[in-house]
C-alpha cells in the first residue's frame, strides 16, 4: 500500500471518528434506520451483487451468491434489528464485597466504541462484510471496510 493510500485511509478514519464523536449519543432510531438501509441496499441490489461476484469469480452461480452472501446478510441484519435494543440495555451486577454492604451498586453500560474495521476475504465478499456490519450497526458503531483485492 502506498503512502498516499495510507494517508487517504487515515483521513477517512479521522473523519469517521469525528462524526462518531459529534453524533453521540445516537438514539435507537438511528441504529434502526442504518440497519433498515443496509437491508434495503442488499435486497434492492441483490442481483447486481450476484452478477458482480459471478463476473469476479468467472464461474460462480448467481444463485449461490444469493444463498451464501445475500440471504445470510439480510438474516443477520434482521436479527440484529430485532434484538439490538435488548442487547444494549444496562445490566445490573452484584457489587463486590464489602462495597455492597455500604450500599454500592454496580451495572454494565453497553456503549458504542467508535469506528470498527472489517477486512473481508475473497470467497464470500458480500457476506463477510455485511454479516459483521449487522453487529457493528446494532452496537451504534461506524465501519471502515477493506474488501479483498482479489474480488
State the predicted function of each range:
Residues 1-105:
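N-terminal Rossmann-like NAD(P)+-binding subdomain of aldehyde/semialdehyde dehydrogenases
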Residues 95-151:
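Conserved small-residue-rich beta-alpha loop and adjacent elements
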Amino acid at each position: 500500500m502506498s503512502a498516499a493510500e495510507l494517508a487517504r485511509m487515515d483521513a477517512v478514519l479521522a473523519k469517521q471518528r469525528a462524526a462518531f464523536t459529534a453524533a453521540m449519543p445516537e438514539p435507537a432510531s438511528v441504529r434502526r434506520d442504518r440497519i433498515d438501509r443496509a437491508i434495503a441496499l442488499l435486497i434492492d441490489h441483490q442481483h447486481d451483487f450476484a452478477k458482480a461476484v459471478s463476473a469476479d469469480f468467472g464461474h460462480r452461480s448467481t444463485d449461490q451468491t444469493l444463498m451464501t452472501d445475500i440471504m445470510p446478510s439480510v438474516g443477520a441484519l434482521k436479527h440484529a434489528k430485532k434484538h439490538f435494543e435488548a442487547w444494549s440495555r444496562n445490566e445490573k451486577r452484584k457489587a463486590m464485597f464489602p462495597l455492597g454492604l455500604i450500599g454500592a451498586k454496580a451495572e454494565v453500560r453497553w456503549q458504542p466504541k467508535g469506528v470498527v474495521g472489517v477486512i473481508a476475504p475473497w470467497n464470500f465478499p458480500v457476506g463477510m462484510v455485511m454479516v459483521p456490519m449487522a453487529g457493528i450497526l446494532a452496537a451504534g458503531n461506524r465501519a471502515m471496510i477493506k474488501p479483498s483485492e482479489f474480488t
